[in-house]
Regions:
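Cleavable N-terminal export/targeting peptides
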Residues: 1-32
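Short glycine/proline- and aromatic-enriched beta-strand/turn motifs that initiate or cap beta-hairpins
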Residues: 25-81, 180-182
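Residues that define the transmembrane beta-barrel architecture of outer-membrane proteins
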Residues: 31, 53-57, 87-91, 105, ...
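Outer-membrane beta-barrel pore domains and translocons
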Residues: 38-42, 74-78, 98, 112-116, ...
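Outer-membrane beta-barrel "beta-signal"
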Residues: 245-250, 258, 277-293
Length: 293
């Protein structure tokens, strides 16, 4: 299934690129289509590993119109253990408008949705204190939709996302409290979580701040700070930081980023892998190489 989806996206990219080629060759071109293929030593989202600390691939196609309209389709490989039952990939679709001066104030507004085909989990949404048994087992998916606001000044960019879907990547009473109950040696915090009642995480906020410093014509220093505030589940709140270098050479972009997530509840960032439990929130050097067409 994953091969088929990758092949479909590659074919779509090739078709869109061939259609756009005549327009780009014309001085009156009003839009562009760019395809990017990337190989990474680890697929990290907000500094948390989606690929269980293993290598991953990304394929993206971006459409940009001179009016400011943009659209993005991106496929990334992920771990089916991190995202239970998944087909091994997720798909990000986004559209919106960007406007302003790239060297001064610039802005963006849009909508985005992440799909995790096949990914779902069953978890208890309540806990009976009288019997000591979890109850109300329900199925939850990881698919998430966002409203996106971008603000920037020169090389400084901020991105604010608000979760529109019922849950943020499965964050719910079953997803958060259930994970804590399953993996914690002391169930007290999980029971406190359940005691707050049945909640979802719609309305959560994700904020990122990025600054790029040119070191030369080909090399850029990247600085990042971010935070997420998950509605109804303070246990899932955390901040992340990274510092990296991007270098352009031989038609490729080479990058090295040291990512540092600062989480509060380790059980929420652990994955059962056979008879082992692996943490996906460790500090790590992430290497990547990409090519744009």
């Amino acid at each position: 299934m994953m091969k088929g989806s990758l092949l479909s996206l590659v074919c779509a990219s090739a078709l869109l690129s061939s259609i756009a080629a005549p327009a780009r060759a014309d001085d009156t071109a009003s839009y562009s289509i760019e395809t990017e293929v990337k190989v990474l030593s680890d697929q990290r989202t907000r500094s948390i590993s989606d690929s269980l600390n293993r290598p991953a691939m990304q394929l993206g196609v971006q459409f940009a119109h001179e009016s400011g309209l943009i659209a993005l389709a991106q496929l990334s490989t992920i771990s089916s253990k991190s995202y239970t039952g998944s087909a091994g990939y997720d798909v990000l679709l986004a559209t919106g408008w960007r406007f302003g001066d790239p060297d001064g104030w610039h802005y963006g507004l849009g909508l985005a949705t992440e799909f995790f085909p096949g990914a779902k989990f069953d978890a208890p949404y309540a806990f009976d204190l009288n019997t000591g048994e979890p109850t109300n087992v329900r199925r939850t998916r990881y698919d998430t939709s966002y409203a996106v606001l971008e603000l920037g000044w020169g090389a400084l960019d901020a991105r604010i996302l608000n979760v529109l879907s019922k849950n943020y990547r499965g964050a719910s009473t079953g997803g958060v409290c259930g994970q804590m109950l399953a993996l914690s040696a002391d169930p007290a915090r999980a029971l406190d979580c359940y005691a707050r009642g049945d909640h979802n995480s719609r309305g959560s906020w994700l904020v990122d701040l990025d600054y790029k410093i040119p070191l030369s014509d080909k090399t850029t220093l990247k600085l990042h700070a971010g935070t997420q505030r998950i509605k109804n589940f303070k246990e899932a709140n955390y901040s992340d930081y990274s510092i990296g270098v991007l270098h352009k050479q031989w038609g490729f972009e080479w990058s090295a980023d040291y990512v540092m997530p600062k989480t509060k509840t380790r059980e929420l960032f652990q994955v059962v892998d056979g008879n082992k439990i692996r943490s996906v929130d460790g500090n790590r050097l992430v290497l990547a190489v990409s090519r744009k067409f």
